[in-house]
Amino acid sequence: MKWTEVNVKTTNEAVEAVSSIFDGLDAVGVKIENALDFENYRASNPAELMELKDIPHITEGAIVSAYYPDDTTNIDVILSQLRTKVNALVDFGLDIGEASITTVEVQDDNWATAWKKYYHPVRITRYLTVKPSWSDYQASFSDEKVISLDPGMAFGTGTHPTTRLCLQALEMTMRGGETLYDVGTGSGVLSIAAKHLGASDVEAFDVDDIAVAAAQENFDLNPIAKDIKVSANDLLKGINRPVDTIVANILSDILVPLIPQAKQLLNSNGYFILSGIIDDKLELVIDTLIANDFKIEEVLHYGEWRGVIATNRKDD
């Protein structure tokens, strides 16, 4: 079978947003080539004998590729919508780089499985490791928690800097027994991690029905996540039950309207963990948190990305 491969040359910062755009444009599959992924893998596995030159890869930026059957009749419309949506990411403060769009004909569907050989288990934090669903990797020490994900979904693999910041913050703040909301769950990795770290009750939300389905598939891959409830919802609108922790890894401009909602739903001294914040949006997020009477406990850094740990001040 022949396919049309559509490629967007962009930045590490924009890969997840571009992937989501492709998903909304009915791509059959999405592939991400990210120069930073190779550096992260090498840094996470310093003892492994691995020559990056043996694996075809780009050395800077990222390429997000999507696949459409060659008989797709509206490919020109898709390309036009893609260009508009990618350019609009600038309005959310994302650096999209050159954002060039190219197409190429692919002769068969080997792309659908060939990428699997480049995915390996990755140690994300002190205790949390993410592995692809087909890997038979087992925990190598007693406290290691292994999360199984299907990287074929266009909602991240747990290794993006914003996800790492959230996972680190969860590990820093959770003590066991917490109730938690995961807002903008995507792959569901944060919800699964929360269960591994001792959360007693987790609910996950995403505005995208496809993300909800992807998260449910990943929950099904992890026995510890079998009781996580996931549903489509616009942030926390209509949610009434207070919880101990709220975690959100979404764009800064979406975090801002979430903050007053989180204020109403967090128990006294509960933790609010935010990520997806580029450096020049950090002040806006922190100012909004303070205006809503949150206490800033810590700001985490990973490259150009920032994460914030805040607590809901106890009423005097």
UniProtKB/Swiss-Prot annotation:
Annotated InterPro entries: Ribosomal_L11_MeTrfase_PrmA, Ribosomal_PrmA_MeTrfase, SAM-dependent_MTases_sf
Species the sequence originates in: Pediococcus pentosaceus (strain ATCC 25745 / CCUG 21536 / LMG 10740 / 183-1w)
Residues that coordinate or bind S-adenosyl-L-methionine: T163, G184, D206, N249
GO cellular component: cytoplasm
Superkingdom of the source species: Bacteria
GO MF annotations, alphabetized: protein-lysine N-methyltransferase activity
Name listed for the protein in its UniProt record: Ribosomal protein L11 methyltransferase
Protein's cellular compartments: Cytoplasm
Keywords: Cytoplasm, Methyltransferase, S-adenosyl-L-methionine, Transferase
The enzyme's E.C. designation: 2.1.1.-
Family from the record: Belongs to the methyltransferase superfamily. PrmA family.
Enzyme's top EC category: transferase
Major localization listed first in the record, in broad terms: cytoplasm
The keyword S-adenosyl-L-methionine appears for this protein: yes
Record flagged with keyword Transferase: yes
Record-level GO BP terms: methylation
